Amino acid sequence: MSEPLKPRIDFEQPLQPIDEPVLKAAQAFDQHAAENFYPADPELDAENEEGRVEGLVNAALKPKRSLWRKMVTVGIALFGVSVIAQSVQWVNQAWQQQDWIALGATTAGGLIVLAGVGSVVTEWRRLYRLRQRAEERDIARELLVSHGIGQGRAFCEKLARQAGLDQGHPALQRWQASLHETHNDREVVELYAKLVQPSLDNLARAEISRYAAESALMIAVSPLALVDMAFIAWRNIRLINRIAALYGIELGYFSRIRLFRLVLLNIAFAGASELVREVGMDWLSQDLAARLSARAAQGIGAGLLTARLGIKAMELCRPLPWLGDDKPKLGDFRRQLIGQLKNTLPKKDKPAQQ
């Protein structure tokens, strides 16, 4: 017995042809492009993206040059020239008329103006030094992907002089002994980053650990919130100054404000996700709520924020970018803070219980 025929199926729309992927046209590379080809580095791309975003925000925060601003600048310049010309005229008249009081007052005013100009020049020089450090990091990034020879050693020796390392420093001697004529710029800079730079980074880490511990203990034992905020602000500024001095940067008023702003912007860019990830990794497993008081928990939070501030200050003051796992992690400082609070707070509570 034959099977019954299936009924006919009518489709509302005609069948569409299968869409084939569109292939790109062939691209031929010349010999020069093949020799200068480098594989993509995800860490370097992330650093470049972070620097690009930071530059965009800094450009957005800078006031735009307008016609009124130019007119005000020209007016101030003309006023300064007029004041100088009038002062010279007063000095000449006072000398001819033997008016010693007017001559003394004019001389005192001139000394004050010279002191002000000197302060402005000094601040500009320190601010320029801070900007130059960012340019040195860009040069270091270029050398870390370069296969040339000759520029890496001179660059690293310049960094050593800026850091105040003499030729007799053990780390610098080990680096010089490890160099060979066949090393390219990338290998020379990597050796410097592994042998010389850690000597400065370890000092900065020790300062961050000490300041973070002091902030945590102060918050944990102090009953006054206003005193806590003033103390934390003062210690954080001291920490930034100390880290900058370790890396050979002398901060002035404006350069200190700029560095502090860059640090805060860097923290804002990273967001709270990194802080939550680092702090919350083993927060619940250690059951800190049962072991430490609420004030101690607040102290840990303040200490971690101080440590994060110090890490970002290190990143902005270092002449070299981070390589691999060299960047300090909040987890290292977290364990130190928890251990110090556990050892300190029970000692303070035992006499009260007795």
From Swiss-Prot:
It is a multi-pass membrane protein. InterPro entries: DUF697, UPF0283. Its main location: membrane. It is found in: Cell inner membrane. The chain crosses the membrane at residues 71-91, 101-121, 214-234. The keyword Nuclease does not apply. It holds the Pfam family DUF697. Keywords: Cell inner membrane, Cell membrane, Membrane, Transmembrane, Transmembrane helix. One of its GO terms (cellular component) is plasma membrane. Belongs to the UPF0283 family. NCBIfam families: hyp_HI0043. PANTHER family: UPF0283 MEMBRANE PROTEIN YCJF. This is UPF0283 membrane protein YE2117. The lineage of its organism: Bacteria, Pseudomonadati, Pseudomonadota, Gammaproteobacteria, Enterobacterales.
